[in-house]
């Protein structure tokens, strides 16, 4: 039994200012108070029931040892020399050993003993760590300088051994010694638990507002512009691939274009650039195969006018972009100012599964690609290109696909999580989204021309409802947007675009209806001036043009303004009005109220 006492003089490893020291005259005075209340059989049974057999044995040994009077304790010969050796090697801790070993540990153990039935299993294991060290000397690493000891059969001797200081530090660092202010009270047995971190915080952490992550942006890619698609980004993306977004067929999504905050020096001829938003297949695919897929899709549409990509007639488009043009069935272009952020709403009318005649085939991923050109040079100078993958579903399929990916992600993370956190997962799952927007990835390939689809139909239908805007600078520039016609078979060659007449380029289409009507009438202004408006009203309502003498415009704020040529020239196509025709002294007064 002498080995159990060998470690008592070296329990205090260093003079740590964080440990509260207690002073006591000697060990017997400290233990005399505890011997007045010896351990009862009920206390021992309770401790054993909680699995603390080591604690019962250790406390029993200490009680038996201090019951013997000090003068009757036997200390073996040779122990004193070794104790002196330890004291000389640890002289800096000499004044603290007695106070720490006798008072601090014994008071700490006694507190644990008196409230054992109130502690949890984890607390008990921490409380008796020091006793475990006493009863299991093999846990300490002995140096080659350890001296032999002569044990005693009846009593524990105060012999000491030399141990590595680092081993002692490692062993006793976890021992928790509460300060007087932190000592637990009988009416408050358990400490207040610290809040546990959310088990899925690595999943739910929102991504930073920046461009695509650095791991898949090529270092030499142009980062002068940033394009975002306001649709949640897919969770599972293969390494090195462009980000992917899930979209619904026929639903309009905003696309934002802006200049990067830290913009490189781009030598533009003006502040305006021309961007082409297109839906294309991977540029690495054979262009003939791409055109075959577009033709297959177009042949299955209910009308020949069905386009792949549409632009919404939202006011946000008119405020930030201009000269919106449908250059192909799968592409549209517009002009915007690099000093302002541009926003345009696009909708897609195809599904990822529309390009195969077989049912049950996995959908083909498409690319949403944005090419930006210097406006003054037409499409001769490509300055930026970015892409992202898109998969198009029907009937809210994009939302279902996102929910499926979320469940898989939580299931994968939940395998290592505690079952007690089901409430946390259930509360977070419904509203979770990987990312609210999808950033388009800049690419370095600025040479490959995208394949644009223009079917063999009347090309005046390319401009919807009379929307005739400025075309590309010339025919050679238009052809540079797609692969040269020499690379296509004769049957797949796209014919040149129809040239617009100067008369068509000035037409403006307005929608008007009366207060009592529910359906709008279309007014086609052959010339964007007051004369053209009077002529259109006269033809539509069969009124003599000479009887129309006043034309007013009533703003939403109620302001009545005389209509003139400047106001009409600034009208965009498809603007809607309420038409009021009033007879005044045999003449007609026209009032257009904004909606």
UniProtKB/Swiss-Prot annotation:
Its main location: nucleus. Residues 29-92 are annotated as: Transcription activation. InterPro entries: CP2, TF_CP2-like. This is Grainyhead-like protein 3 homolog. GRHL genes (GRHL1, GRHL2 and GRHL3) show a paradoxal lack of redundancy despite their extensive sequence identity in the DNA-binding and protein dimerization domains and the fact that the core consensus DNA binding sites are identical. They have related but remarkably different functions during embryogenesis because of their differential spatiotemporal expression patterns during development. The gene is grhl3. Transcription factor playing important roles in primary neurulation and in the differentiation of stratified epithelia of both ectodermal and endodermal origin. Binds directly to the consensus DNA sequence 5'-AACCGGTT-3' acting as an activator and repressor on distinct target genes. Residues 221-454 form the Grh/CP2 DB domain. One of its GO terms (molecular function) is RNA polymerase II cis-regulatory region sequence-specific DNA binding. Residues 484-505 are annotated as: Disordered. One of its GO terms (biological process) is regulation of transcription by RNA polymerase II. One of its GO terms (cellular component) is nucleus. It comes from the Eukaryota. It is found in: Nucleus. Belongs to the grh/CP2 family. Grainyhead subfamily. Keywords: DNA-binding, Nucleus, Transcription, Transcription regulation. The keyword DNA-binding applies.
């Amino acid at each position: 039994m002498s080995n159990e006492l060998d470690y008592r003089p070296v329990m205090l490893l260093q003079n740590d200012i964080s440990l509260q020291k207690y002073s006591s005259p000697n060990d017997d005075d400290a233990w005399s108070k505890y011997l007045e209340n010896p351990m009862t059989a009920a206390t021992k049974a309770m401790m054993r029931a909680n699995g603390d057999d080591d604690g019962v044995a250790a406390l029993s040994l200490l009680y038996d040892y201090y019951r013997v009077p000090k003068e009757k304790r036997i200390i073996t010969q040779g122990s004193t020399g070794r104790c002196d050796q330890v004291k000389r090697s640890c002289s800096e801790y000499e004044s603290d050993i007695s106070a720490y070993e006798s008072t601090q540990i014994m008071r700490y153990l006694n507190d644990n003993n008196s409230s054992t039935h109130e502690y949890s299993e984890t607390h008990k294991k921490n409380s008796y760590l020091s006793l475990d060290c006493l009863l299991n000397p093999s846990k300490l690493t002995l140096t080659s300088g350890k001296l032999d000891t002569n044990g005693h059969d009846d009593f524990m001797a105060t012999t000491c051994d030399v141990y590595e200081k680092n081993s002692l530090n490692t062993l006793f660092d976890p021992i928790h010694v509460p300060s007087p202010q932190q000592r637990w009270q009988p009416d408050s047995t358990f400490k207040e638990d610290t809040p546990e971190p959310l088990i899925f915080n690595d999943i739910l952490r929102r991504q930073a507002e920046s461009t695509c992550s650095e791991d898949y942006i090529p270092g030499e890619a142009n980062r002068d512009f940033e394009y975002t698609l306001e649709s949640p980004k897919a969770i599972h993306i293969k390494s090195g691939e462009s980000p992917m977004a899930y979209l619904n067929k026929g639903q309009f999504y905003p696309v934002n274009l802006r200049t990067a905050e830290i913009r490189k020096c781009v030598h533009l001829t003006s502040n305006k650039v021309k961007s082409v938003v297109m839906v294309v297949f991977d540029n690495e695919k054979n262009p003939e195969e791409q055109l075959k897929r577009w033709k297959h899709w177009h042949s299955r549409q209910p009308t020949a006018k069905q386009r792949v990509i549409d632009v919404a007639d939202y006011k946000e488009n008119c405020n930030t972009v201009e000269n919106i043009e449908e250059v192909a069935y799968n592409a549209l272009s517009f002009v915007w100012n690099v000093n302002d952020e541009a926003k345009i709403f696009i909708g897609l009318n195809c599904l990822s599964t529309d390009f195969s005649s077989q049912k049950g085939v996995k959908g083909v991923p498409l690319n949403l690609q944005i090419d930006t050109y210097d406006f003054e040079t037409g499409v001769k100078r490509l300055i930026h290109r970015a892409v992202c993958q898109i998969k198009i579903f029907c009937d809210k399929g994009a939302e279902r696909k996102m929910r499926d990916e979320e469940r898989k992600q939580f299931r994968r993370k939940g395998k290592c999580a505690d079952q007690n956190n089901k409430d946390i997962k259930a509360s977070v799952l419904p509203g979770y989204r990987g990312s609210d927007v999808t950033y388009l990835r800049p690419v370095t390939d600025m040479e490959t021309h995208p394949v644009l689809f223009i079917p063999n139909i009347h090309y005046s239908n390319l401009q919807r409802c009379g929307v005739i805007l400025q075309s590309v600078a010339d025919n050679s520039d238009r052809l540079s947007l797609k692969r040269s016609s020499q690379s296509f078979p004769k049957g797949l060659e796209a014919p040149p675009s129809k040239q617009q007449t100067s008369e068509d380029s000035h037409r403006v289409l307005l929608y008007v209806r009366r207060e009592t009507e529910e359906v709008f009438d279309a007014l086609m202004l052959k010339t964007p001036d007051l004369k053209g408006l009077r002529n259109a009203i006269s033809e539509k309502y069969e009124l003599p043009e000479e009887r129309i003498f006043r034309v007013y415009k009533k703003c939403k704020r109620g302001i009545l303004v005389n209509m003139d040529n400047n106001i009409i020239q600034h009208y965009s196509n498809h603007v809607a009005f309420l038409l009021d025709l009033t007879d005044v002294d045999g003449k007609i007064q026209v009032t257009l109220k904004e909606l």
